[in-house]
Amino acid sequence: MAEGKKVILKIKRQASTKDAARWEEFALHWRPSMNIIICLRDIAENPVTSEGQQTTPVSYDSNCLEEVCGSCAMLINGKARMACSALVDQLEQPVRIEPMSKFPVVRDLSVDRQFMFESLKRVKAWIPIDGTYNLGEGPRVAPEVQEKAYPLSRCITCGNCLEVCPQVNDHNNFMGAAIFSQVRLFNMHPTGAMHAKDRIQAVMGRGGIEDCANAQNCVKACPKEIPLTESLAEINRQAWKQALLGWLVG
């Protein structure tokens, strides 16, 4: 794009989940290195459609602007991605922007990801430290374990993997690849391993690992390139092992 060009955005808007959605088009002055967040900020400063109609600023979630917080995930030209790293010069115009479809809409592009956080609580996705604060340094972790764990720790809970997963729908409570990857991460930690059986038991229930259909869309959509399919396979293996041992032991 050259100087003087316009950026055309078509944004899907709605006041809440219960309200009907509508589309509004905006024409913005192009600037070098514009991303979608910059476009949304420009609209907020001057909320006027391309037809000259006064409207309200578009509601959206954003924080870090460097693909770390995970809050700005949305559908951009039909693809689940982070708005802060979506450069206008690399997008086909008009740019169509929609809220993610697998989460309830709060307003406009802002969605409620509470389902993900409830799933993380369900699988105890944390390291228990109560009573260990006075035990000195934590347990040592082998370098090879660190190398496997670090990519898993990069999850930003953006929800992209749930958005592209066909198993996450109105008829299924599938928790999504990010959750199982966190189970794998915390089960690898020496302290977290104390609750490994509880986590695996949690993913063996409704919406758990058995509901994965191996579509593998998740690993392609992950902005942090987390090996989600490896995590799904590993958690599936751990679940089968725990189930068989439980059956044999009785």
Give the predicted meaning of each segment.
Residues 3-9:
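Short structural boundary motif marking the start of a folded domain
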Residues 8, 23, 46-48:
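Beta-strand-dominated extracellular/periplasmic modules and repeats
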Residues 16-21:
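Short N-terminal binding/cap micro-motifs at the start of the first secondary-structure element
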Residues 22-35:
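Short, contiguous acidic and Ser/Thr-rich linear segments
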Residues 34-56, 95-250:
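Ferredoxin-type iron-sulfur electron-transfer modules in oxidoreductases and energy-metabolism complexes
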Residues 62-66:
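Serine/threonine-rich, repeat-prone extracellular segments and beta-strand-based repeat modules
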Residues 76-98:
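Glycine-rich phosphate/adenylate-binding loop and adjacent beta-alpha elements
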